């Protein structure tokens, strides 16, 4: 899944609280649309499909998903720019599943606001990330059992890890991650 910047961070000019200037958003959105055309476009009929073919890959990649944002703070700036990108992708490529973000943690304001935005826009999937202690993983094996299955938005758990002080990995962290993942099979309905 290619993950594109939400136009709110990762840009050296503005930091996570800033955003690409609104005057630059149309060009930025076009770059994302061009990426999708490059991945999926017909090599005989599209500009970017032709570039892909000339670069040695004549067949489309059949891209189905694209991530927009990664651990963003869910601010008004984020919401405005994400919504512009999301709507442009849905308009031009309705078959593409946009994977949104619900902030850098699995709790707190950004998580709550990220889910509100997902519900409001009907984002098909969000990428949750979390890094927790072994105790958290042991005591939250039912985390996704509580997930409301009637929601349109599904969860993609793109990043997770058990951390102990110093962020070292050892047998304890490996086993708690394995124990945490065991009930996922039942939760993935």
Residues covered by each model-derived region:
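Substrate-binding cleft and catalytic face of glycoside hydrolase catalytic domains
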Residues: 1-118, 131, 135
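Short, conserved active-site loop motifs that form the nucleotide-linked donor/cofactor pocket
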Residues: 64, 123-124
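Catalytic-core region of carbohydrate-active enzymes that cleave or remodel glycosidic bonds
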Residues: 88-90, 94, 115-118, 124-189
């Amino acid at each position: 899944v290619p993950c594109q910047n939400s136009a709110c961070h990762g840009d050296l000019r503005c930091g996570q609280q800033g955003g690409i200037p609104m005057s630059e958003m149309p060009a930025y959105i076009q770059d994302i649309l061009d990426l999708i055309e490059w991945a999926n476009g017909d090599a005989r009929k599209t500009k970017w499909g032709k570039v892909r073919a000339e670069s040695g890959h004549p067949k489309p990649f059949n891209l189905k998903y694209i991530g927009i944002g990664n651990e963003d703070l869910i601010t008004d700036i984020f919401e405005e720019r994400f919504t512009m990108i999301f709507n442009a992708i849905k308009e031009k490529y309705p078959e593409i599943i946009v994977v949104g973000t619900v902030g850098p943690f699995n709790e707190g304001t950004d998580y709550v606001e990220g889910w509100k935005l997902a519900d409001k826009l009907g984002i098909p999937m969000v990428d949750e990330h979390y890094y927790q202690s072994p105790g958290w993983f042991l005591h939250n094996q039912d985390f996704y059992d509580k997930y409301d299955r009637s929601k349109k938005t599904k969860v993609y758990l793109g990043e997770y890890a058990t951390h102990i002080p110093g962020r070292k990995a050892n047998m304890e962290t490996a086993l708690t991650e394995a124990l945490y993942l065991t009930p996922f099979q039942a939760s993935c309905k």
